[in-house]
């Protein structure tokens, strides 16, 4: 069993072309990524509204897109692409542990598919509502 961490994209991005891990500029993404690394996972990916499952080293251009504006049908289609990509990169959806460092719109349809069997949602599991509470959780966990 592998441990996989999925960190959601954020709206604040550096302009231009960057490695995916360097594209996202917000304190929330930086802390979530730092926390993801602290978990010593086998793999970390970014859940991107535009690029779907994004490898940290992938070279990508900035964009302005969020799942928050997607219809339910579009989010379901997005999730199906993510699930397909997860399988292609060697993630075992039934056996590997998936940790979502993401809001509900980024994990809801992935989990609803029933394909991911072992998962954690630290933000939801700790009843964190709002960026301030999430940042506090991440900062406390990194102490």
Task: Please name every model-derived segment.
Residues 1-143:
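Peripheral peptide segments
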